[in-house]
């Protein structure tokens, strides 16, 4: 790839054309230690070490822009796909540093972003492979390569609203080998259990495309100001997700309210109910978070509830879920009748020209028992999770180091099996990520 860089300067003598390029290197180390305190000390431990190269390119001329972001990654060491002798399961997190759908491939190259856009006074229209920043479709990945989406989009402003609509025909989901149709992308991750308690067969889901619509505006209520955001995710004939976020701040205090509602569309993806993706009629979620800043530290408490209308369902590999009770290395997707409460603190400080960001949080997730497949798709026990993380940036953000530790302990009222324990509870997970911007985005 580096050999080709000189040829990208074509056209740079034209003053109306600007071409910029950049290169970033990533090293990602990860390990999960299973069976730390409980009865299953024999469970397999996992580790993985990957390195990657990211090449960025932007070409701008008049109102046109071409944007590219190519990722290459290589698994250098580890045992992410080794089967545990007791349960037959492999790793949950470490396998995400390569391709879950192609475990035989230790090296990947994905043209994650290749986007042509045109900007006018009123709107921007784009076509190709692009990123999104929704609550469920986004590039916040925690892996080597983020999720990106292929199709077209429209962004516009008017009447105090910022709006975006995207039609998506293919998805390059994180931890997979590349772009696939929406139907194939729905089927490629952990199937979990269906509403009958059997392995969920998603291989014949009919999902021709997806539509993402997002609208947001600034709001003011007396001494409070903030942001109101509405999102709609639609997969025709399968399901629709409607989400509302309201943030209001006053002085050092911030309140964040969330509401989510899901509806089954058509037959849920297949005429055979056992092969449909969305096998329930609906689901509903409520969330609230309060944070208060003291000096340079934000203290917060958050709570959320998924009620008994059904499980919250969304392809978990399409991005991080931005629920108010989110903690790194955990999801609430696949859960119903689930209450979560998280408390924590985050802060920022500088020392010796190094900028630091860090935080600690602990949360309790009260779920239905793992055997309750109607409301617990992945047989997850109730648990307490504690996260500690620390990020450092120096030399103008050219160097970035992120460290994270996660501890999960079970809170189930019933005994849990080894299969319900491995990679889920009674475990310690560590992640270390180093990113070096070898060449900041600059003009050729």
Regions found by a protein language model. Name each.
Residues 57-61, 117-120, 155-158, 167, ...:
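Residue-level signature of outer-membrane beta-barrel architecture
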Residues 57-88, 99-181:
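Outer membrane beta-barrel
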Residues 213, 424-444:
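Outer-membrane beta-barrel "beta-signal"
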Residues 17, 45-51, 108-112, 145-150, ...:
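Residues that define the transmembrane beta-barrel architecture of outer-membrane proteins
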Residues 17-25, 64-68, 125, 154, ...:
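Transmembrane beta-strands of outer-membrane beta-barrel proteins
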Residues 76-78, 164-210, 218, 251-326, ...:
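Outer-membrane beta-barrel translocator/channel fold
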């Amino acid at each position: 790839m580096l050999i080709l860089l000189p040829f990208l300067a074509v056209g740079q003598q034209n003053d109306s054309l600007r071409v910029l390029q950049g290169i970033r290197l990533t090293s990602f180390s990860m390990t999960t230690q299973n069976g730390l305190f409980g009865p299953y000390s024999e469970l397999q431990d996992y580790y993985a070490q990957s390195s990657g190269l990211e090449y960025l390119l932007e070409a701008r001329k008049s109102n046109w822009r071409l944007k590219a972001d190519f990722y290459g990654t290589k698994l250098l060491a580890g045992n992410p796909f080794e089967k545990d002798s007791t349960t037959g399961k492999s790793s949950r997190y470490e396998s995400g540093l390569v391709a879950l759908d192609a475990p035989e491939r230790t090296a990947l190259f994905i043209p994650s972003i290749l986007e042509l856009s045109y900007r006018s006074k009123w709107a921007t229209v784009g076509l190709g492979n692009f990123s999104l920043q929704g609550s469920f479709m986004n590039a916040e990945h925690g892996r080597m390569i983020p999720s990106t989406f292929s199709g077209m989009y429209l962004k516009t402003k008017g009447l105090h609203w910022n709006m975006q609509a995207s039609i998506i025909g293919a998805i390059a989901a994180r931890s997979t080998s590349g772009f696939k149709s929406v139907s194939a992308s729905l089927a490629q991750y952990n199937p979990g259990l269906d509403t009958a308690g059997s392995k969920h067969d998603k291989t014949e889901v009919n999902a021709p495309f997806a539509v993402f619509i997002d609208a947001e505006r600034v709001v003011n209520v007396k001494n409070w100001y903030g942001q109101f955001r509405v999102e709609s995710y639609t997969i025709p004939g399968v399901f629709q997700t409607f989400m509302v976020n309201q943030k209001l701040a006053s002085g050092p205090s911030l309140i964040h309210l969330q509401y989510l509602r899901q509806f089954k569309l058509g037959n849920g993806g297949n005429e055979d109910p056992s092969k449909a993706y969305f096998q329930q009629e609906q689901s509903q979620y409520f969330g609230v978070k309060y944070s208060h800043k003291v000096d340079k530290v934000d203290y917060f408490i958050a709570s959320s509830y998924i009620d008994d209308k059904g499980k919250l369902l969304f392809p978990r590999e399409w991005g991080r879920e931005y629920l108010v009770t989110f903690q790194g290395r955990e999801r609430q997707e696949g859960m119903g009748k689930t209450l979560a409460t998280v408390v924590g603190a985050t802060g920022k400080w500088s020392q010796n020209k190094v900028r630091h960001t860090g935080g600690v949080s602990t949360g309790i997730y009260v779920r239905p028992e793992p055997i309750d497949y109607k409301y617990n798709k992945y047989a997850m026990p109730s648990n307490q999770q504690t996260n500690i993380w620390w990020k450092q940036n120096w030399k103008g953000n050219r160097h970035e180091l992120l460290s994270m530790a996660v501890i999960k302990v079970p809170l189930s009222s019933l005994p849990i099996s080894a299969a319900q324990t491995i990679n889920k509870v009674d475990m310690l997970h560590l992640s270390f990520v180093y990113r070096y911007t070898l060449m900041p985005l600059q003009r050729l």
